Amino acid sequence: MVVTLKPRNILFIEPGQKAARWLLPDNDHIMSDSSDIREAATNGNAQRMIATAVLVKSTTGSPESVSGKLLLFDPSGRTIVEVANNGRNIHLTSLSGGDLTILYERNRRLVLTAFDPGSLAKRGEQEIDVPQPK
């Protein structure tokens, strides 16, 4: 039997700051899914972190069947955006064409949401109808 432990919170520590900050106000949740969004490496330079998307779910119930809160935050944790309050899974994150995009499941539908990669301001959201296979 394999047991996978999921993180419950993220601690942000910044050089020169005396106090650290937690992403969440408590440890009563798990981060069932996460995805780092990075800028492509150029000329041998390391990839630069743009943001992280995490799906935060209650510790009660099965993480696979419970919906949760989808958050997007910058590397310092100072800018935190609530993307959705009833997300199920993060399917894809990407940075292309000047947009940071997240494809996730909400209410048994796929949702594609675009953000500005600098400010994390929402630029648009589109629900995608997925037909049942025959």
Q: Language-model features: where?
A:
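Surface-exposed loop/turn elements that mediate protein-protein interactions on large endomembrane-trafficking
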Residues: 5-34, 65-86, 111-130
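Short secondary-structure capping micro-motifs at structural edges
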Residues: 37-46, 53-61, 67-69, 82
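Conserved beta-propeller blade repeats
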Residues: 28-49, 86-103, 129-134
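Mature extracytoplasmic/lumenal regions of exported proteins
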Residues: 57-58, 68-76, 94, 104
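Short beta-strand elements that form the blades of beta-propeller/WD-repeat-like
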Residues: 1-12, 47-64, 97-105
